[in-house]
C-alpha cells in the first residue's frame, strides 16, 4: 500500500540523531517525515540522564549554533549545571548538565509536533526501496510504502539488537523496545561493511532506599551555565545535587567471583564496548591495582525516585547486581528498580560514508548516530543535524556541505569516522582536534551561525541575536582600544593595585587586558574603563580574543598552510593503479576508500606525503590541476 503523500526527506528513528536530522531538513523548507516505532519515546535518554562534558559539550554548542534543538532542550530540562575544567584554558572548558528525563523528552516532543514542514508517523521500518543504486523510500512493518528523494537512517542500537543480563539474552533495541531485525537483514544485503558493537547501562536505584547522610554531595555551579546561545538561566528548572560513593574491595571480590556468569567474559558477547565508559567488571579486571572506583549518583528527575549510578554499568546476573550495589557505602539496603544490561547491535563501517553522511554505494541514503559506530547523545545529535541538512540539500539537487576539521568538532567527527573508521564506540574528546584553541565552546556561533544562516538552518530571531552580539563585541573592543591610561592619569593607584608590577608607560584598555593577571571584570571595575557591557557572551569573547590573540593568529596561519590542497577534488572513477609511482599498499587503500578530496586522502592511515605529491602531479597531467598548483 502506497502512502498518499510523497516527501523530500524521510528520517527513520526518533532518538537524538533522528530528531536533529528531521528538524534540520524541515528548517530548510523540505517536506520531511519522521518515522519512529513509538512516538512516546521521541527524544528519550536511553542511558545516562546528562548532556555535555569534555568534547561533547562542544558538539552541543555547535549543534545549537546551527539552529539545532539539543541545547535548548537541556536548558529547559537540566537540574544541575556545571562547567568542567573551569580553572583551565577556554579551549578545554566544557558545559555538562544533569537532565530530568521526563522534562527533556517532553520538550523534544513538543518541539517536533510544532515544527513546520515536519510530519510524525508511528511505524517501524522493515525495508528500503532502492532502484538503480538510489534510495526511493521505505516500507514499514505494516507494508506501507513511503516515497522520498532522500532517506536518513538513525536507528541507534536497534539493528539486530540483543540484550544480555548474565548468561540470558533476548532480542531488543533497548529495555522494553523491540529490535529492528528485518531492516538489519535488508541492510546486510547491501554492499556495506557491517560489524557488531556493545554498550551497557547500570541498574537504576530507588532513592528512598539510599542513606544520603553518608554520601558526599556534589552541587552545581552558581550562577548556572547556559547551554544555548538563545538560552537564559530563567529557563532552568529547580536545581538539585548529585552524590558520590565508591566501590570497595568487597564490590570487586563479588565481581571477580562471578566472572564466569558474565556474558562478556564467557564469550557470549562478540561486540566491542566503549573504551571510555567500560562496565564495572571491565574496570575491576583492567585496573586490578585499584581497590576503589568513584561512582556518581545522578537523579533521574524532579518527580521520580530513580537514581542513575554512573560507573557501574554491568551485564552480570541480577543477583550479582544486587550484591554489587549493596556493597557500596550508603547503598547497604538499596532497592534496584531496573536491572543493568548490555546490548549488542549492528553498526556499519563509516568509511563507507561521504563527508556529508551519504553512503557511497546508495545515492540519497544517509546514516547518522550509533549506526556509524559512535556512542553518546551529543555525537548522535551532531551527526543527525549534518545528515538531515545534507539529505535536504540532496533532495534539492544542491551540493552537500560539511565543516572542515579546523571549523568545528562536527568536522573532526565526520573526518575521523569517514577516513579512519572505528573498531570501538567512538566518543568525542577535545584531544581529537588539532586546532582546539579555535574550536571552543564559547565561539561555536562565531564559527558556524553565519554558514548555517546561508544554508537555511537559522531563523530570524537567532540571526538577530547573533548580529547583536557581533556588534557588541566590536564596539567594546574599539572602546578598550581607544581608552588610554598613563602613569600620571587619575586612578593610576586603583589600577596598580591589580597589577603585579606598577604601570610605567601609557597603555590602552586592550594592552592592560592582555596582562595575565587582569580580567575583563577587573578592568571594567576601574573608573577609567567602566562600565562593563551587559552582554556577557560578548564580554567573554572580548577577553578571550584579546588575551589569546597571538596564539589564535599562529593557529590560523598553520591552518592556511595546511589547506592548500584540502578541497582539491579527486575523480570518483579514478583507478589508482593507473597512477604511476604509487605503492601497491597505497593503491589498495585509495581504491578501497575512494576519497573525495586530497585532504581526505592525506588523512587515511598509510597514505604518505610522497603519495600526495604523486597524486598532485597526476591531477595536473589529466587537467584537474592548474599549472604550478602542485608546488603551491
Swiss-Prot record:
Residues involved in FAD binding: 13-18, 125, 180, 370
A Pfam family annotated for this UniProt entry: SAM_GIDA_C
UniProt cofactor(s): FAD
Keyword Metal-binding on entry: no
Binding residues for NAD(+): 273-287
Chain's role: NAD-binding protein involved in the addition of a carboxymethylaminomethyl (cmnm) group at the wobble position (U34) of certain tRNAs, forming tRNA-cmnm(5)s(2)U34.
Family per similarity comment: Belongs to the MnmG family.
Protein name: tRNA uridine 5-carboxymethylaminomethyl modification enzyme MnmG
Lineage, top ranks: Bacteria, Pseudomonadati, Pseudomonadota, Gammaproteobacteria, Vibrionales
Amino acid at each position: 500500500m502506497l502512502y498518499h503523500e510523497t516527501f523530500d526527506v524521510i528520517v527513520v528513528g526518533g532518538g537524538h540523531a533522528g530528531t536533529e536530522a528531521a528538524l534540520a531538513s524541515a528548517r530548510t523548507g523540505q517536506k520531511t517525515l519522521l518515522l519512529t516505532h513509538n512516538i512516546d519515546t521521541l527524544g528519550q535518554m536511553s542511558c545516562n540522564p546528562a548532556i555535555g562534558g569534555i568534547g561533547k559539550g562542544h558538539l552541543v554548542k555547535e549543534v545549537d549554533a546551527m539552529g539545532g534543538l539539543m541545547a535548548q532542550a537541556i536548558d529547559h530540562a537540566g537540574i544541575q549545571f556545571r562547567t568542567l575544567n573551569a580553572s583551565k584554558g577556554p579551549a578545554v572548558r566544557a558545559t555538562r548538565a544533569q537532565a530530568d528525563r521526563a522534562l527533556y523528552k517532553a520538550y523534544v516532543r513538543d518541539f517536533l509536533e510544532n515544527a513546520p514542514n515536519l510530519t510524525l508517523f508511528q511505524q517501524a521500518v522493515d525495508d528500503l526501496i532502492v532502484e538503480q543504486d538510489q534510495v526511493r523510500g521505505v516500507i514499514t512493518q505494516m507494508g506501507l510504502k513511503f516515497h522520498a528523494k532522500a532517506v536518513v537512517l538513525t536507528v541507534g542500537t536497534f539493528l539486530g539488537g540483543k540484550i544480555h543480563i548474565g548468561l540470558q539474552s533476548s532480542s531488543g533495541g533497548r529495555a522494553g523496545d523491540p529490535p529492528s531485525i528485518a531492516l538489519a537483514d535488508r541492510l546486510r544485503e547491501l554492499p556495506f561493511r557491517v560489524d557488531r558493537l556493545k554498550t551497557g547501562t547500570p541498574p537504576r536505584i530507588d532513592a528512598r532506599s539510599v542513606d544520603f547522610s553518608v554520601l558526599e554531595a556534589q552541587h552545581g555551579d552558581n550562577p548556572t551555565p547556559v547551554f544555548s546561545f538563545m538560552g537564559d538561566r530563567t529557563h532552568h528548572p529547580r536545581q538539585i545535587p548529585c552524590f558520590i560513593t565508591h566501590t570497595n574491595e568487597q564490590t570487586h571480590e563479588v565481581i571477580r567471583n562471578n566472572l564466569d556468569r558474565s556474558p562478556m567474559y564467557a564469550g557470549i558477547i562478540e561486540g566491542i564496548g566503549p573504551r571510555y565508559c567500560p562496565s564495572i567488571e571491565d574496570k575491576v579486571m583492567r585496573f586490578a591495582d585499584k581497590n576503589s572506583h568513584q561512582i556518581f549518583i545522578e537523579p533521574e528527575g524532579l518527580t521520580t525516585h530513580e537514581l542513575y549510578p554512573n560507573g557501574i554499568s554491568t551485564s552480570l546476573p541480577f543477583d550479582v547486581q544486587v550484591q554489587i550495589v549493596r556493597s557500596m557505602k550508603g547503598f547497604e539496603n538499596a532497592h534496584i528498580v531496573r536491572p543493568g544490561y548490555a546490548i549488542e547491535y549492528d553498526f556499519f563501517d563509516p568509511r563507507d560514508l561521504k563527508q556529508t553522511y551519504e553512503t557511497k554505494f546508495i545515492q540519497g541514503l544517509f546514516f547518522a548516530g550509533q549506526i556509524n559506530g559512535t556512542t553518546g547523545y551529543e555525537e548522535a545529535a551532531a551527526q543527525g543535524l549534518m545528515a538531515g541538512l545534507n539529505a535536504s540539500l540532496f533532495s534539492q539537487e544542491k551540493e552537500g556541505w560539511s565543516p572542515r576539521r579546523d571549523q568545528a568538532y562536527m568536522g573532526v567527527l565526520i573526518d575521523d569516522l569517514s577516513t579512519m573508521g572505528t573498531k570501538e564506540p567512538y566518543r568525542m574528546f577535545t584531544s581529537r582536534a588539532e586546532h582546539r584553541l579555535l574550536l571552543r565552546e564559547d565561539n561555536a556561533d562565531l564559527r558556524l551561525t553565519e554558514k548555517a544562516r546561508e544554508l537555511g538552518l537559522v531563523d530570524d530571531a537567532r540571526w538577530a541575536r547573533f548580529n547583536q552580539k557581533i556588534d557588541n563585541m566590536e564596539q567594546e573592543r574599539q572602546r578598550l582600544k581607544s581608552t588610554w591610561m598613563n602613569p600620571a592619569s587619575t586612578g593610576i593607584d586603583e589600577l596598580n593595585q591589580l597589577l603585579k608590577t606598577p604601570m610605567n608607560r601609557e597603555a590602552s584598555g586592550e594592552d592592560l587586558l592582555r596582562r595575565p593577571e587582569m580580567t575583563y571584570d577587573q578592568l571594567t571595575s576601574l573608573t577609567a574603563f567602566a562600565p562593563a557591557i551587559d552582554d556577557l557572551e560578548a564580554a567573554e569573547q572580548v577577553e578571550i580574543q584579546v588575551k589569546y590573540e597571538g596564539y589564535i593568529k599562529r593557529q590560523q596561519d598553520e591552518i592556511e598552510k595546511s589547506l592548500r590542497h584540502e578541497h582539491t577534488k579527486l575523480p570518483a572513477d579514478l583507478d589508482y593503479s593507473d597512477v604511476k609511482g604509487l605503492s601497491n599498499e597505497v593503491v589498495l587503500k585509495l581504491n578501497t576508500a575512494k576519497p573525495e578530496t586530497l585532504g581526505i586522502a592525506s588523512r587515511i592511515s598509510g597514505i604518505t606525503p610522497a603519495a600526495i605529491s604523486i597524486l598532485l602531479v597526476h591531477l595536473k597531467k589529466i587537467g584537474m590541476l592548474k599549472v604550478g598548483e602542485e608546488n603551491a
